[in-house]
């Protein structure tokens, strides 16, 4: 963000691009400002057996961040609130980010804010958050969208029958195929007579589904 510093003249949000979220940003910014924070980090609780897959955020009773644990083992984790990769900053944050050199938000900036005891807060929020850092996570995200579990994210395409959505120019005789939704079929895909598709399933474009 150093390269775009001149554009940030008010509260701004930085987020990782490998997650599917439906966060209420207006509410998040409101909480950030109420705390008088120079930086805030959106957190989410996970089950105890999941903490080893994420960065754990340790904060006091007021939400002030005191420490981080990067993918700790279950027995060593100091909490179950994790870093979602969604951050809110005030422009003054650049006073603590050196220009012209590599400086990582998580590895360099956040420990510096904690060490200097600056107003750096964890903001627990109730929202849908699906990490898509691995292939199984990507499939999980697709499945959740197809099953309507992700608020404000609709299945694209045309619904040709309940729970079955298609892109453009899908070739199929719908009376001779067995499809149980939720299913999305990409454009230009051909489905042969007698084929069976059971959801939740997403089929990419230009595929051929045989009997």
Model-derived segments and their meaning:
Residues 1-146:
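Unchanged
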Residues 35, 92, 96-211:
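Left-handed beta-helix
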């Amino acid at each position: 963000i150093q390269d775009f510093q001149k554009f940030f003249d008010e509260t701004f949000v930085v987020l990782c691009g490998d997650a599917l979220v439906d966060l209420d940003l207006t509410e998040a910014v409101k909480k950030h400002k109420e705390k008088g924070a120079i930086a805030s980090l959106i957190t989410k609780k996970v089950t105890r057996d999941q903490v080893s897959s994420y960065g754990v955020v340790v904060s006091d009773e007021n939400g002030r961040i005191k420490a981080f644990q990067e993918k700790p083992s279950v027995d060593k984790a100091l909490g179950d609130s994790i870093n979602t990769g969604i951050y809110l900053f005030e422009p003054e944050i650049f006073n603590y980010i050196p220009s012209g050199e590599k400086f990582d938000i998580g590895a360099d900036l956040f420990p510096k804010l904690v060490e200097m005891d600056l107003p750096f807060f964890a903001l627990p929020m109730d929202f849908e958050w699906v990490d898509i850092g691995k292939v199984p996570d990507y499939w999980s995200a697709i499945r959740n969208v197809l099953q309507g579990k992700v608020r404000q994210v609709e299945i694209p395409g045309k619904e040709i029958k309940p729970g079955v959505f298609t892109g453009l120019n899908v070739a199929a005789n719908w009376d001779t195929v067995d499809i149980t939704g939720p299913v999305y079929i990409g454009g230009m895909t051909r489905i042969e007579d007698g084929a069976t598709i059971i959801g939740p399933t997403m089929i990419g474009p230009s595929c051929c589904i045989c009997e």
